[in-house]
Amino acid sequence: MDSEQRKHALALIQQALPDLDWTLQATKVKRLSRDFHWFSPVLKQQLEDKQADAVVRPRNEEELILLVKACVQHQLPLILRGGATGNYGQLVPLEGGMLVDMTGLNQICELGDGVVRAQAGIRLAEIEAFTRPAGWELRCMPSTYRLASLGGLYGGGFGGIGSINYGPLGAPGNVLSVKVMTMEAEPRILQIPAPQALLLHHAYGSNGIILEVELALAPLHRWIERLDVFDDFTDALDYANAFARSPGLVKRQLALLAAPIPSYFSHLNGRYQANQHAVISVIAQESEGFCAGLLEKYRGYSAVRQTADEAREANASLMEYCWNHTTLHALKIDSSLTYVQTAFNYTNYHQQIIDMAALFGDEVISHIEFLRDSDGNITASGLQLVRYSTEERLNEIMVTFRDNDVKINNPHVYQIEDGKQGEIKPEVVSVKKHLDPNGLLNPGKLRGWEVRNTLILDNDPLLLPDR
């Protein structure tokens, strides 16, 4: 479908649905068609001229059903938008079409004992504000939790804060079920339990429309946020590693930031020296007493300490200096930087971190996040900053990591599989075939769909009771 055909289809849909909340002004549509893919100079260039033809914000499921029916009737692409905090162009329309702002579907549906079910458009911070008085909090969330939506986390995210305990969002037990709308002439609404629900996780909204997500929660703790500094990188790494591997220390977040990364945190400058390395931790109040001994052992110093309540009141949480917020703070100071995403081996991540830091020197700056993997192993992932020169050199850096047994989750590509070692998953494509048979959801993002005729696809990938 070319641009003129899309404009004609859009005009017919608007004429049929005039009461919906439309955004048609070109500058606003372009702005709403953007996320944080500009962290990557490669994606920034590739996606520069990509945008939707219109944006619409449904107020409820009934309006969304009308939109889906209309888009299927006119074969117009439909792309879902949450908080637009993604980093890989997850929401950027490759073939124009309708961008659906899901933030109108923002209600808590149910809160139980350690379980919450909410609509996809709700912000993660709003979920926690609701669950906290009942003694619960999210198990894992990105550093963008104040803006990011639940559906965006599910469809385009990984995990983040809390993953030191519960692993990534897709680890068994974190997601309990999802409610999904199909992209069909007569849309169906399906309840899909885990583990089948995870076939729609991190699929960029390309194989189903997430309406609700049911999550297991974590017990609420009185958290202390700390930033401790070290003169020696190995001391900082050893401190963070000891912290991570102490099961009795109750924690929510743990990140290692090599110099000069802490100096990019302009709001914290003056608390430490520019050449010092930092460890940011979020630790339960009852466990904080152990920090003093660990700091003394590894020659560290306390630079910032605040309670989580103080951080919320000031809108100044140290959690917003971790994960890809680190990259954002750095880019505000030095726009020539970019980053890579690495996954170290849980059996020897400590040595790998040291070796790779020594190998690249100042060209690649260590930003390490500690977490559990899906099997429960304590390990480390990196969002290392890179002094960007050329795309060729950036690719060489990623190859070097791989050659040293460090996995790369490439953040400089927009197709789902290319960010995950290039692996096409037939089961994910099968779900798209069943829930989006015309291929209208976020077209171009799922490479497996382009080669679906060469794959052996499951006739019932979700084990649906009506099939």
Feature locations, PLM:
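N-terminal flexible segment immediately upstream of the FAD-binding catalytic core
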Residues: 1-69, 85-114, 261-269, 313-334, ...
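Short amphipathic alpha-helices in soluble, non-transmembrane regions
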Residues: 13, 71, 239-245, 287-301, ...
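General beta-strand structural signal in soluble alpha/beta enzymes
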Residues: 22-26, 57-58, 78-82, 100-102, ...
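Conserved glycine-rich FAD pyrophosphate-binding loop
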Residues: 76, 83, 90-97, 103, ...
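FAD-binding subdomain of flavoenzyme oxidoreductases
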Residues: 109, 124-125, 129-248, 458-467
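Glycine-rich, acidic
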Residues: 238-268, 303-323
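A conserved active-site cap/scaffold subdomain adjacent to cofactor or substrate pockets
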Residues: 260-305
